[in-house]
Amino acid sequence: MKDLKAELEKLLVNAEDCELIARLATEQDKRRTFSRIATQLREIAAELKADIAARSANIS
């Protein structure tokens, strides 16, 4: 479970990094690309968070 929580944290940090890169990018294509990557990472993080919650509920 600790591994999953660590991965969740990494995903969220990477999403924040991509959002920062998107804001600082000078080219429109790069802004869109990094914004899209950030969105995808947040979606994956949400799925992982739900999986962690489901596993925690099963343990209890």
Where are the language model's segments positioned?
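Long, non-catalytic architectural segments outside compact domain cores
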Residues: 1-60
